[in-house]
Structures are given as structure tokens and as C-alpha cells.
UniProtKB/Swiss-Prot annotation:
Gene name for this UniProt entry: rpl18e
Protein name from the UniProt record: Large ribosomal subunit protein eL18
Keyword Ribosomal protein: yes
Keyword Signal assigned: no
Annotated GO biological process: translation
Pfam families: Ribosomal_L18 (PF17135)
UniProt keywords, alphabetically: Ribonucleoprotein, Ribosomal protein
Length: 121
């Protein structure tokens, strides 16, 4: 018999439910995909460094990380980063480059029908 593993973080559970709900209401499949990625075990969740965001993004682009953004590397252009969480050094480097750090819950409420977003894992 397979053991079902459930999330114990109530904020994450609420976020996943909200993402699924917005996906069906707005017809935006991206939120369903992000919810599925967040349901993975913690050890399989994305942890992305600033250097990877720098390599795979362009000026004034929106990047979504379904996990944590870490502060290793440099960012040389302005980018809007949406993630589950940020390390303090990552937040400082993004803001120093003129970018913006947003949480997943905030972006889903403000702009549920978002377009032109790049997912980086």
C-alpha cells in the first residue's frame, strides 16, 4: 500500500487551492501547472540561483520560480521575479538591479490572467 504524503504547511495548502481555483476561473493553465509543481515533495522543489535567472531572462521580463530564489550570482538587468520564497541576499540583489520581488499569492490575486511569464526551475 502506498503511503499518501500530505503537506503540513497551512499557507502552502491554501496557496495550492487558490492556484487551482484561479486556474479554473480564469482559464489560465499556468496556475494549475504551478500548483502541481508546488505539490511535489520539498526535496524536489525548485531552488534557483540569481545567476540562472540572469542567464535565462531578458530586461523587464517576468520570471516565475515555483520554489525558493537563492542569492548566488549576479543580476545585471531589471527583472520581475515571482516565487514562493526568497533568501535575503537574493531579495537584495534583485532590488539593487532595479527588479521586483513578488510572492506567488500576491501575483495571483492582483493579476490572475497573467501573460508572457517564464517559469524557471
Amino acid at each position: 500500500m502506498v503511503r499518501k504524503i500530505t503537506k503540513t504547511n497551512p499557507n502552502l495548502i491554501k496557496l495550492i487551492r487558490n492556484l487551482r481555483k484561479k486556474s479554473s476561473q480564469e482559464g489560465a493553465a499556468i496556475w494549475k501547472d504551478v500548483a502541481r509543481r508546488l505539490e511535489r515533495p520539498t526535496r524536489n522543489r525548485a531552488a534557483v540561483n540569481i545567476s540562472k535567472i540572469n542567464r535565462h531572462s531578458d530586461e523587464d521580463e517576468t520570471v516565475l520560480v515555483p520554489g525558493k530564489v537563492l542569492g548566488s550570482g549576479n543580476l545585471d538587468h531589471r527583472v520581475q521575479v515571482v516565487a514562493l520564497s526568497f533568501s535575503q541576499t537574493a531579495r537584495d540583489k534583485i532590488e539593487r538591479a532595479g527588479g521586483e520581488c513578488l510572492t506567488l499569492g500576491k501575483i495571483v490575486e492582483e493579476n490572475p490572467a497573467i501573460k508572457n511569464i517564464k517559469i524557471i526551475e
